[in-house]
Amino acid sequence: MSPETARPFIDIHAPVAQALAAGRPVVALESTIITHGMPYPDNGAMAANVEKIISDGGAVPATIAVIGGRIKIGLSDGERESLAMTGDAMKLSRADLGFAVAQGRTGGTTVAATMIAAEMVGIKVFATGGIGGVHKGAEKSFDISADLDELARTPVIVVSAGAKAILDIEKTLEVLETRGVPVVGHGCETMPAFWSRQSPFRAPLTLYKPEEIAHFFRTRVALGLGGGVLVANPVPENHEIPAEEMAGYIEAAQKAAEALNVTGKAVTPFLLGKILELTGGRSLKTNIALVENNARLAAEIAKAL
């Protein structure tokens, strides 16, 4: 779908439209973290605060979602709160974004769907928590997130805390390399692992300043290389849960998912919910902290572009 033919299906929130028209920095935000990633009311409060962080950082936030079949680029306070309370929202990626629009449905946009919508309107920077990737046991289940293909195809900078730690990070990095997606550790030479600052794997590339990341992206665009850039930004040290501790929680959550035969799109929300329970709420606090940290960096990158 080209941007021109997509416009009749898109509603751009007035502050976002004004910023785009004036060439001011805009940062996209996804909405599955609202609809599927956190319980209410934490999800709504988190989303509002992340938008404020981006605004305070000198950029305009644009939370992306599908509401009643309309692709929303930026939400009003009422729309954001209503989405946070929606119990039956779809989880939308490239495969079902068009379905939700055609059927008048409401859904949270994954990394992939958010990248698509952002690129349609010219937003080049997007802050999220963690990307999807290769699930553990994918050699049997073939459960690999569409986020990875979208990163290879859509020219958007995605600021994350790496891949979600419930995934097979090593295989996720291998797929990203195969698909030609640059993975940049922000100020780190080791890949972060979502709730934890370090994983056993090296960051393929390292840059230290938002201006360097912006320059790298502009250079890729000028060279016609296509696709996005994944920025891996470690969670602040005072909020991390060490990887050794998280490993036990993740293993227990995965065993519970297997016992209940949880599959497909239900896997990630189930695992996140189980880990929230096992950590006594600590994982949620860390998740919120890392999203806020990514929003701050994304605002700086957007200003540098």
From Swiss-Prot:
The family database entries (HAMAP family) matched by this protein are listed as:
PsiMP_glycosidase
- Cofactor binding note from Swiss-Prot or TrEMBL: Binds 1 Mn(2+) ion per subunit.
Instruction: Supply the PANTHER family for this chain.
Output: CARBOHYDRATE KINASE PFKB DOMAIN-CONTAINING PROTEIN, ZGC:136858
- UniProt cross-references to Gene3D superfamilies, sorted A to Z: Indigoidine synthase domain
Write down the EC number.
Answer: 4.2.1.70
Q: Which Pfam families match?
A: Indigoidine_A
Q: What class of enzyme is it?
A: lyase
Kindly give the InterPro entries that the UniProt entry links to this protein: Indigdn_synthA-like, PsuG
Residues binding Mn(2+), per UniProt? D143
CC cofactor: Mn(2+)
Question: Could you tell me which species this protein originates from?
Answer: Mesorhizobium japonicum (strain LMG 29417 / CECT 9101 / MAFF 303099) (Mesorhizobium loti (strain MAFF 303099))
Q: What is the protein named?
A: Pseudouridine-5'-phosphate glycosidase
What family is this?
Answer: Belongs to the pseudouridine-5'-phosphate glycosidase family.
Does the keyword Hydrolase belong to this entry? Answer: yes
Q: Name one GO molecular function term.
A: hydrolase activity, acting on glycosyl bonds
| Superkingdom of origin organism | Bacteria
